[in-house]
């Protein structure tokens, strides 16, 4: 927030370095987001590089049994959808599946807690769409609540979209991310 060095590329190096030995401490959850072109250092109202959805995805990607909110409490009151979504992401996991990853470039991971699955993707400064086959799911059908980059996230990094869809075990979905973006989902079995 006070350096250009803490950016989406950096975020995609940490799972391969600091997290190799186990959980790590980090401060995701920034509400003030900027593209590389719009970023400036602001000590009064800190800004993070990358999209709001990138920040949401970090809660699933980074393993930390004591997660935190990195921003001012006032900012979470102004962003209730974001605050509500990240508050539902657990801090411990029963299972983890690495779907795809390339250090410093992109990553998609699935984690399980109880009966729910949590899916997240991160990208560097390149927009990308990654096809993910949901063959790791156990139940037949799931409600998938998605927090993803909005259509304008490539120029306004705080733009996001939420949606709910029904998916089935074995379906293929596209994890589409803006430059510096992210994608996160909570999958709850339908019984």
Predicted regions and their residues:
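Short, glycine-/Ser/Thr-/acidic-enriched flexible segments
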Residues: 31, 66-67, 115-116, 124-126, ...
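Active-site proximal loops enriched in glycine and acidic residues that flank catalytic Cys/His/Asp
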Residues: 72-73, 121-123, 134, 146-148, ...
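C-terminal beta-strand-rich structural cap/linker in extracellular carbohydrate-active enzymes
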Residues: 164-191
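Solvent-exposed beta-strand/loop surfaces of large extracellular or lumenal domains
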Residues: 146-170
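Glycan-recognition and catalytic regions of carbohydrate-active enzymes
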Residues: 71-118, 154-158
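Glycan-recognition surfaces
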Residues: 1-73, 99
């Amino acid at each position: 927030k006070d350096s250009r060095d803490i950016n989406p590329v950096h975020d995609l190096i940490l799972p391969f370095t600091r997290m190799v030995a186990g959980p790590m401490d980090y401060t995701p959850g920034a509400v003030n987001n900027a593209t590389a072109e719009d970023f400036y250092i602001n000590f009064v109202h800190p800004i993070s590089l990358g999209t709001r959805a990138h920040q949401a995805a970090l809660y699933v990607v980074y393993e930390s049994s004591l997660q935190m909110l990195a921003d001012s409490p006032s900012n979470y009151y102004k962003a209730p959808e974001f605050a509500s979504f990240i508050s539902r992401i657990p801090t411990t996991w029963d299972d983890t599946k690495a779907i795809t990853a390339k250090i410093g470039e992109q990553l998609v991971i699935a984690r399980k807690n109880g009966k729910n699955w949590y899916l997240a993707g991160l990208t560097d400064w390149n927009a990308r769409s990654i096809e993910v086959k949901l063959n790791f799911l156990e139940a037949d059908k799931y409600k998938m609540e998605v927090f993803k980059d909005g259509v304008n996230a490539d120029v306004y990094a705080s733009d996001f979209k939420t949606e709910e869809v029904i998916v089935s075990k074995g379906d293929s979905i596209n994890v589409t991310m803006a430059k510096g973006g992210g994608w996160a989902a909570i999958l709850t079995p339908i019984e």
